[in-house]
Design a protein with these regions (language model features):
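Active-site nucleotide/adenylate-binding loops and adjacent lid/helix of ATP-dependent enzymes
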Residues: 56-218, 265
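Hydrophobic anchor at the start of a short beta-strand
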Residues: 37, 90, 113, 152, ...
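ATP-dependent carboxylate activation and anion-phosphoryl transfer catalytic cores
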Residues: 1-32, 171-193, 245-349
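Extended, charge-rich helix/loop segments that form flexible
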Residues: 194-255
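Structured, non-catalytic alpha/beta "coupling" segments that mediate domain-domain communication
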Residues: 25-45
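Short, high-confidence coil segments that cap the C-terminus of an alpha-helix
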Residues: 110, 149, 280, 406-407
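Hydrophobic residues within alpha-helices
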Residues: 26, 79, 357-361
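Phosphate-binding loop of NTP-binding sites
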Residues: 335-452
């Protein structure tokens, strides 16, 4: 019996169901401040706070994020143009749509090249350090596969180290140097054995389950190994470093080192200015430079990309260096000091009289100027308008009210059945009322006495 296959399947289910590291970190920070949350879909769309006081996040895009800023960042051509116009260092490049234009673009830009889709993200479709037209043709086809628009960028390959600068609320909060997945030879082990050894690091796991991701040997990896003159069964010479992925993303097995405290002030100022140029409250700026402690203009480095919805993982848990709580400034912006996103909640339970009590309290709240949502055994009401009929005294009905952005006061009938079946739709309330406890429902769910 292959137990490991079942364990791996469970890992995959967990990765599919749980919040990603970036979303999860923001939710954890919210919870630490007493801010309630509701997951709105099976992915990364989350509501923080209740009713009229709610904010939303989807990974690291928030309800405060500029839509036009996201559109600009997702279009590398627009991003590069705006940065170029603002005298920000960017690589020389060209935009093409057809393969027949590739040779001319290569001659214009000059080798070595980077080829990538104009609308790509997370490193998809990117090929770097291209040194011939033959390589460029393969890279062009790869970029096309990852592009929705079919528009491809051909730009100069800038040498140096890959840095990610994270700017939140127009302030640099973290910086990391990223290294692509790689192995270093010892003169004895095959490349596959070296990969297995790297993957045995307890910090590496499947997907986002740990701070690092295991290195997989896909077709791209095999191509890079072949281009270096090896196969997976080759013994790598001692101290030789073999790159296994085109990009330095942690999700493909890369590593990250925190360098926040050594970024040159000119580069800090540039990153913060870029966030305003692109108009993003949260952005990840990718820079290639030989030395982040010097201004970009002194090293010949360049800004490669500006990313909306950047990943936080490399900053929350870098491979080396100081972890940064980059979720904190996100919550600072969404919920200024003293705000917790809550609305008043009155919850009513008991054997008899719950609905009458709920209606009475909702009426009193409405007469005092509140926009009331309430649940009863005959339906859900928002400002006395019936929106859902039937017995609506369970947790899903409570969530219905707490999700409504027009509600600033909730009165929730919470019947015994829903409590036993699925609990409450909220983790705490301001006022809890038990009308009475009678013998009406004895004998159900293992309850046989009033004392029970």
């Amino acid at each position: 019996y292959a137990l490991e296959k079942d364990i791996q399947k469970m890992r995959e289910i967990r990765e599919d169901e749980r919040l990603g590291p970036s979303t999860g970190s923001i939710v954890e920070e919210a919870v630490s401040r007493g801010i309630p949350w509701i997951r709105l879909n099976k992915y990364s769309l989350v509501q923080l706070g209740y009713g009229a006081n709610q904010k939303r996040i989807q990974a690291t895009v928030t309800s405060e994020t500029s839509s036009i800023g996201v559109e600009i960042a997702c279009d590398k051509e627009d991003t590069k143009y705006l940065l170029e116009q603002a005298e920000v260092e960017v690589p020389r490049g060209d935009i093409i749509r057809k393969e027949r234009s590739l040779e001319e673009a290569c001659n214009y830009v000059g080798f070595p090249l980077v080829i990538k889709p104009v609308d790509g993200n997370h490193g998809r479709g990117i090929t770097v350090d291209i040194n011939s037209l033959k390589e460029a043709l393969v890279a062009f086809a790869h970029a096309k596969e990852s592009s929705r628009s079919g528009v491809i960028i051909v730009e100069k390959f800038i040498t140096g180290d890959d840095y990610r600068l994270l700017v939140i609320n127009n302030q640099l909060v973290a910086a990391a140097i990223r290294t692509p997945a790689h192995v270093v030879g010892n003169g004895k082990s095959t490349i596959q054995e070296l990969i297995d050894e790297v993957n045995s690091d307890p910090r590496r796991g499947y997907g986002h389950e740990k701070v690092l991701t295991q290195i997989t040997t896909n077709e791209l990896t095999k191509t890079l190994i072949k281009d270096a003159g090896y196969t997976l069964d080759s013994v790598l010479p001692e101290d030789e470093r073999l790159i296994l992925k085109d990009t330095a993303n942690l999700s493909t097995g890369g590593t990250a080192e925190d360098v926040t405290d050594i970024v040159h002030p000119a580069n800090v100022s540039m990153a913060e200015r870029i966030s305003k140029i692109i108009d993003l409250d949260i952005c990840g700026i990718d820079i290639m430079t030989s030395d982040i402690t010097k201004p970009l203009s002194d090293t010949g480095g360049a800004v490669l990309e500006v990313n909306a919805g950047p990943g936080f993982r490399m900053h929350l848990a870098p491979t080396t260096g100081l972890p940064r709580n980059v979720a904190a400034p996100v919550i600072d912006k969404l919920f200024p000091k003293g705000k917790n996103g809550r609305i008043p909640i009155i919850a009513i339970t008991g054997t008899n009289g719950k609905t009458t009590t709920t209606r009475l309290l909702a009426h009193i709240a409405k007469m005092n100027g509140h926009r009331v949502g309430y649940t009863t055994s005959d339906g859900v009401y928002i400002q006395n308008r019936l929106l859902m009929t039937g017995d609506c005294t369970g947790p899903s009905s409570a969530e219905f009210v707490l999700k409504d952005p027009t509600v600033n006061f909730a009165v929730l009938e919470s019947a015994r059945g829903g409590l036993l079946r699925a609990g409450l739709g909220f983790e705490k309330c301001d006022v809890a009322i038990v009308t009475n406890v009678a013998a009406d429902h004895l004998g159900l769910k293992g309850i046989h006495t009033i004392e029970q």
